[in-house]
Amino acid sequence: MINRVLIRTRVLQVAYAHLHRGELSLSAAEQDLELSLQRTYDLYLYLLQLIPSLTDFYREVLEVRRRKHLATQAERTPNMRLVENRLAAQLSETPELTAWYAGFGLRWEDDEALLRHLLRKIEHSELYQDYAHARSDSWAADQ
């Protein structure tokens, strides 16, 4: 989320840029600051949307693995913990985030290579292994 430290940083960046450009217009600096904060907020929402996009992509990957001709037992009955993550489900059901993402120009789904790379990193991480094999199934564990 946008916090005070980020706002202070943006204010100093905009003030520095306007000082070195020789512009002394307060209204122009204010408009630049508003634009900068809006872009930061858009980036924050875009990164939030990565979570449901990643779980949806993982669901598709698991389905492809399941339909493989010579699928192993692990591929036929995969661990669905990440696909059924409560945080991802709640984010995908948030109407404000869904509406914003529908109007935003970029899509995580368009960059399949990045999603595949992130999934590979996640699947091989020790943190994911602990999460996937944990006995407790709670909201706190999903976060």
Locate each region found by the language model.
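Class I Rossmann-like S-adenosyl-L-methionine
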Residues: 1-143
